[in-house]
Design a protein with these regions (language model features):
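Catalytic cores and adjacent flexible loops of soluble metabolic enzymes
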Residues: 1-161
Length: 161
């Protein structure tokens, strides 16, 4: 079995489509099989943060996701996301992503939309990569994704990384 090399772009594109496209191309040139972004809403996770304007600018909207997915396809590199709210699943499904990533904070089920987001992803039947770095109830997570192919990742969730 060949390892999947995923380049984590996350929010490092700072809301700039041109910067994101450059990163996608560089990831492809470096030999990555896939690029992964994060699809969250600033209001859900960062309301009141002192760097609100910068954070809000880095939000991956549906329109931006569509542009980046199209560009990744043109570069022949897979595009997928960590998803933090259920409507993002609908967006990514309309774009035809092949898999989903679940952040360890989502596995804690502490955020407003965590459970609903997990259930929305599970309903797609697509493979999921699940981080358990912050913990969470692995048995419950496995039950939610009983019909999906699951890959668990274990890491130290210490930021900045």
């Amino acid at each position: 079995m060949r390892a999947l090399i995923v380049a984590e772009i996350a929010s490092n594109w700072e809301g700039s489509i041109s910067k994101a496209k450059k990163l996608i191309k560089e990831c492809k040139n470096a030999g990555a099989d896939a690029v992964k972004f994060q699809m969250w809403r600033a209001l859900d996770l960062y309301e009141g943060h002192p760097d609100w304007k910068i954070i809000k600018k880095s939000e991956l909207t549906f329109k931006k996701a569509e542009k980046l997915k199209k560009y990744a396809d043109e570069q022949n590199i897979e595009f997928f996301c960590s998803v933090f709210y259920p409507e993002a699943v609908d967006c990514l499904e309309s774009l035809g992503v092949k898999k989903y990533k679940i952040a360890s904070r989502t596995c804690l089920l502490n955020d407003n939309y965590s459970l609903e987001t997990l259930e929305s992803i599970a309903k797609t039947g697509k493979p999921v990569i699940i981080s358990m770095g912050m913990g969470g109830n692995k048995k419950r997570i496995m039950k939610i994704f009983s019909k999906n192919k699951i890959t668990f990742c274990y890491c130290i969730s210490e930021y900045p990384a």
